[in-house]
Amino acid sequence: MYKRQETDSIDRHIAFNLHLADSIGALSGGRYDVTVKPLVEAWGFAGRQAERHPDVDSILAFVGREKVRVEEGRLVKADPRVQLDFNSIAKGYTVDLLARLVESFGARNYIVDIGGEVRCKGVNRQGGPWRIGIETPFDGNMSDGEYVQKRIRLTDGGLATSGNYRRFYLDADGNKVAHTIDPRTGRSAVSRLLSVTVAAPTCAEADALGTMFLAMGADDALEAVRTMPDVKVYFILADGADGYEEYISPAMEAMIMQ
């Protein structure tokens, strides 16, 4: 986004997304940063062919939130090669905008779902809570609901799931390269944390938090969650060759359907 050094005035959507990204970034210890786009492109996850051996150190010179500032309503970048990537928020934010539109027509009970990013309110046709299936995160699972690990009750708010089991490839050495990039190292954030589901007041917030936890990796994400008593998360982690381990935060437990 924006390959010039200075932009025209940013609109309210960009301003909101940037503010939310900064809020999540402050929680992440440097693992969540929307200036990650040059790295995403180099690893082949932005519609470009992956570089065989990306020059990560050189690219990192153009990554870092401190390299972008807002000045008189415009984005100003330290270098024109700095680029912003709001993909970790945009789908959730779009869901929120659609939910707002639905409510403007007077709907009291609804669900908006774009590719697993969900915002809902009220109850379903049977008068019960909305039930959201969380996929089993085996590599290449494109079944769209055929393999469900858990179901979650939701009556009001947003829900988003992030995972590295769909968008990935194996490099020349057989190593898994997933689309979630750690902006500190410039490399794929692959760990035994396979899937992250977050419930939050808005889908945009849930979307961004899910990406943050995934980028942190299993150990750091679990440690972070334990310092956030109100966060609602469901983690699926690899356990051995084919097994799974689950972590459900105390605030999420009542939402899990057994």
Regions found by a protein language model. Give the residues of each.
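Mature catalytic core of soluble alpha/beta enzymes
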Residues: 3-258
